[in-house]
Structures are given as structure tokens and as C-alpha cells.
């Protein structure tokens, strides 16, 4: 590999505008850890009227997953935190895919070679593997010995002319590189004292992360880099690269890791951490945003229930601690109930929920639907208002426990008689009560009138409730009988009670 010489260095430029980026590798689909990083970048940019960029770091071509790039942006849009600039949306600083920016990395590497900050390395994979094994045998961390630093210019030219495969390595200096991180404060790392010179451009012309991220952040005018703390030590290398290229580095903020509740790392092998999995289960996007921010820091208080506009308002980067954030997925149902309730209570959101649930009911129950009325917006909204706080997703209303809402139950005379000898008397008394009007006005009024049925039918209140639950739902458990009746409405309750009298 031969790099053209004589490329001019780009001088530093000012960056008055806040520009942040989420730069995942499309080697997999978006999971909760990536969502959290993207969200913090989004919140930071929105607070400062800045720009949120999606950049795809696809230089590791062997590990690319088909469809992952498109899926990542799909999930950001679904979560309500779409990028302002991306390969899909365009922008003034594209391309937004690293494999389409190779000429920029070649130019930067050439500049570093010309100024003596980088050099060609011709060491074979076999030699590098021997160095690694030798270090391990002696109990040291593997590192490159910088052998090719000492090659004379004539030797380099001869090897390049002979077509010997080469990479480009950056010369690390041994001093401590100090900088102020917005999360970790003043920090410094002497990477040159413990690591060998890193590869910045591979033999195939593709850059490594270190060069690509620096070049892209410069050319895309990134003002702040919010990324995982696993890159904290590498920042020392990046700052040396910025200095060598005479560019102004961005401000760094390294976010603590998002871990499982037991302290273990989130793994892509955990199928339940991918956003698509949550979406398929009917989890609302705002639930996940609230869950991942609640798991860590960045807010003055750790209350649950924040929606996106509240997250933007309350986010404070100075409140992010260096401690790992522990994700408790056992709380997902609680978060889901809260956010679904808030949607139900929002008139505009409730209209959307009603239509969504209608389509779900039609798909699930199709020809079994008891009457066209159960697909009317008024009926579905009534169901949602009565069930809010009890359900964590619309899919809960499609479970067998709630099938009575959409399908009339089948009850046999044997079932009815086994429940109570006064079953038909109970059905008659309740139907008369309903037809008299006024009983289905409120839960309190209905519950009060149902208590009077037991004395009128020589039955216990418990027996009355069991009979009504059977006739209305053919189930032994579920919502209260009063709620069932309010949900179904006067006409449907009477239809189901009349069926019992005809047995």
C-alpha cells in the first residue's frame, strides 16, 4: 500500500455550534446500551439547540450485518430521537458512512507520514503473533515493539517498491496526555509508556477506529463527543492525533457503562436487550427512554415517568457520575404501565391507541368478534380508560384474560348450575337492575347496587359475583365484575345475561 505524499494539513477551526454524533458500528442491531448513548447525545444537542448526527462506522467490513445500518436509524426514529444528519436524511458534512470517506483517512495518514508523526510498518502477522505470545509467557501485556520506527527512508522506499504489505502506525509519545472530561474531570494517561504504536491505516486502505473517529469528528465539526467510558484511555491517543494534525479536539464526555442489575455486562447474546424485541412486545419507546435514564445518572432526581420533553428539560450532564448504571429490567412492567397510562390520558395519543388496538383486535379475533360495536372508538376508549394503570401494553388486552371484551363467552347450563342454584335468578335480577337505568354510571354506583342483588336472590355476595363473572367472561379471575360491566356497556351485558336465561 502506497500513500500519496504532500497532502496539506488542515488547520484548526472554531466550532461555535453544538454538534454531537452517535457513531455505532453496523455489526449488529441497536440494543439498550446503544440507545442510552444515542439518547444522551440527543438530549445534549436539543438542550443547546444543536445538531445530532448519525454516523455509521463500517470500517470493519468482515463483521458487517446485512440490514443493520438501516435498522439502527429505523430504531432511532421509532424511539423519537431521529438524527438531524445521516445517510438517510442527508446533510452538509456527508457522506455519513465511513466506507464512503476513505479518501479523507488516506489524506490524514499521508499528512502524518509527511510530518514524521507516522510510519509504515511491514511486520507480518506471524511476527506480531510471536510478540504477543512472548509477552504472555513473560507475564506482560502484549504490545508492538515499534520496530519499524527505526527503518531508514531508503529501506521504506525499497519495501514499498517491492510491494511488501504495509500498514501505517502513529508514533505515540511517552508523556501523560491530560484533558478535562465533562464526566470524569481532569484525567491523564501515558499510553505511549504502556502501549506500542497503534495502527491507524490498514493494508487494505481502511482506517482503524482511532484515525477514523478523529478525522470524521474534525471534518463533521463535532463539538462534543459523548461516548462510552471504554474509550476514555484511548482519548489520549486521539488527542495526540489531533495535535499532530494541528486540529482542535472536541470536548469529551465519557459515559459510564450500562450494566445488568447484577453488575454483568449487557451482551448481544441477551435477546431481550435489542430494541426490536421490545417493540415487538408492544413496549412504548418512551418507556425505554425513561428506563435507561432512570438506571443511571444525569438528572437532579431519580424519579420515574419522564417523557422525552421532560428528559430534554431535566437532563444535566454535570450530574452524570462515574459509577456504572445498573439496568433493572424487572421494573420494565412498572415503567410500561405508567407510560401507557399517560398516553391513554392524553386525548391525541388516546385516539392513536384506539385505532392501534382496533387493528390488533381485528387481526387477533377476526370472525369471533361479538359485535361491531366493540370496534367503535367509544367502546375501545372506554376499555382503555378503565384498564389504565392495570396493563403495561395494548397486547395485554388481547390475552385470554381480556378476551371477554371482544368475544362473547360460551357458558353451558352445567357450568351455570354448578356455580349456583340461583344463577338464573341472579341473571334476571341484574338485568332488571341494568334496564332500570342509572346503575352503569360509575364504578361506585354499580358496586353499591350489585351488593343488593344477594338479598333479592337469597344468595351470598360472593356467589353473585362468581355467577356474573362466569356469564360475562366465562373466567374465574380478571378485572372486577363492576369494571367488566362498565366496559361492556348496558346492551352487551343484557345480551350475555339473556343467553343465560335461555339455557
From Swiss-Prot:
Catalytic activity line of the entry: tRNA(Glx) + L-glutamate + ATP = L-glutamyl-tRNA(Glx) + AMP + diphosphate; tRNA(Glu) + L-glutamate + ATP = L-glutamyl-tRNA(Glu) + AMP + diphosphate; tRNA(Gln) + L-glutamate + ATP = L-glutamyl-tRNA(Gln) + AMP + diphosphate
Motif placement: 'HIGH' region: 26-34
Keyword ATP-binding annotated: yes
GO molecular function list: ATP binding; glutamate-tRNA ligase activity; glutamate-tRNA(Gln) ligase activity; tRNA binding; zinc ion binding
Top-level class of the enzyme under EC nomenclature: ligase
Localisation: Mitochondrion matrix
Cellular component per GO, a single term: mitochondrion
Pfam families (UniProt xref): Anticodon_2 (PF19269), tRNA-synt_1c (PF00749)
Motif interval(s): 'KMSKS' region: 265-269
Protein keywords: Aminoacyl-tRNA synthetase, ATP-binding, Ligase, Mitochondrion, Nucleotide-binding, Protein biosynthesis, RNA-binding, Transit peptide
Residues annotated as binding L-glutamate: 21-23, 57, 209-213, 227
A GO BP annotation: glutamyl-tRNA aminoacylation
Residues that coordinate or bind ATP: 31, 230, 265-269
Transit peptide: 1-22
CDD domains listed in its UniProt record: GluRS_core
Catalytic activity, EC: 6.1.1.24, 6.1.1.17
UniProt cross-references to PANTHER family, sorted A to Z: GLUTAMATE--TRNA LIGASE, GLUTAMATE--TRNA LIGASE, MITOCHONDRIAL-RELATED
Protein family per UniProt: Belongs to the class-I aminoacyl-tRNA synthetase family. Glutamate--tRNA ligase type 1 subfamily.
Task of the protein: Non-discriminating glutamyl-tRNA synthetase that catalyzes aminoacylation of both mitochondrial tRNA(Glu) and tRNA(Gln) and participates in RNA aminoacylation for mitochondrial protein translation. Attachs glutamate to tRNA(Glu) or tRNA(Gln) in a two-step reaction: glutamate is first activated by ATP to form Glu-AMP and then transferred to the acceptor end of tRNA(Glu) or tRNA(Gln).
Name this protein carries in UniProt: Nondiscriminating glutamyl-tRNA synthetase EARS2, mitochondrial
